[in-house]
Amino acid sequence: VSGWQSPACEACRLGLHAETYVMTLACPRRCFFCFNPNQADFDGRAAGPRDVVRQLEARARSGAHLRHVALTGGEPLLHPDEAVAFFERAWELFPGVHSRLYTSGAGLDGALLTRLRGAGLSEIRFSVKTDEGAVAIEEVLALIGEAVGVIPDVMVEMPVMSDELGFMKELLVRLDRMGVRGVNLLELGFPLFNGEEFVRRDLKLKGEPYRVLYDYAYAAGLPVAGSEEACLALLRFAREEGLSIGVHYCSMENKHTGQVYRQ
């Protein structure tokens, strides 16, 4: 970690009083590294939306005392009214809860940002898709800039490709100037499918393929070579440049360990 770290990241490591809810696995993006199609019930959840408000209410009735909740997908903002209702209900059921939203920015505008803030949203995490071209990147950066000053903590969360170190350094500097609170750098993972896209990009596994000896509720994958080194280089860069933005590295091992605790 370099600088600020989201309290949600700290809670995620042990899964204490923290839960993430999936409204839908449907998404307008087609990221080659996406884990979601590897979910056991992907076909059944792709359309959505799931009744995440009812799930929250069930957890409250069971005696849960949640301090961190998140809404993810897919793209939760394909269903904006339901997303707002989720955060409103989370605040009612668990006063003071830290809430966060994961989004590509699809369907987001100033009016929806204001509604989300009014519903109690604490943190929003945007993904920047480096392979979608300059125009798409500028569009999401504009949304990120609009979110700064509306949502208390604005973040970017994205996997790091080993050959995009230069781009990522420029992005960190730009996000820092925009007033973005933090960046969560993810170790790129192979999602156990879509292998032809990884071959086309000359991406290789970090180690020899191995059988995952755990029944993960969230089907993750195997780490890709070079991504961790690039993430660590970006951490050093942020410190050496004195950037104010918080930079956090989340390895595939960290994701797996956190899930073991949660399950």
Where do the PLM segments sit?
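Canonical Radical SAM [4Fe-4S] cluster-binding loop centered on the CxxxCxxC motif
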Residues: 4-50
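Core AdoMet radical
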Residues: 38-50, 63-79, 93-108, 119-140, ...
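N-terminal, charged/glycine-rich beta-strand/loop interface patches
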Residues: 56-60, 83, 90
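Non-catalytic positions within long, well-ordered alpha-helices that form the structural scaffold/packing
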Residues: 60-62, 117, 176
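Distinct, well-ordered alpha-helical segments
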Residues: 81-88, 109-117, 136-140, 168-171, ...
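Conserved C-terminal portion of the radical SAM core fold
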Residues: 139-258
